Amino acid sequence: MNIRKEYPKVCLFLWILGMCFHAHPILAQSVIPVPLKMEQGTGSFLLSEKTKLYTNLQGGEAELWENYLKALPVQLKEARMKDRKQMLFLLITPKTPQLPSPESYTLSVTSQRIEIRATSGAGLFYGMQTLLQLMQPASTGSYSVPSVEIEDTPRFAY
């Protein structure tokens, strides 16, 4: 075995191994499409079987979201508005300056809760897609979501 031939391979292997274990920050460019506004916070939310779901959706839209959420890697329990910890909120709200179009959404992640607000189901869908991109496996059956504040709206009308 010639050490000169093996040395570059060993160095490359150790560099790759080190990159695998290095925690990479979530950048706006990591989310596709790139959100209009994204602010990284500190800490993260642990999405697990203990996470509860609260939504103000009703009727057919609520049933549609119930089926959609069954596809998540974590099954969520229903909650009441008074519950405050380990919560995922999906909320339809009136139109605001932060939510100018039906496809706009805000996504807020703290260590206690995840909140997606939109003026329509389409906005909630896009917010959920962004949340799925941010989820990173943490331990068996749970996912870590970094603390972040995102406001997004389509740049072009469809």
Question: PLM features: what roles do these ranges have?
Answer:
Residues 1-30:
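Bacterial Sec-dependent N-terminal signal peptides
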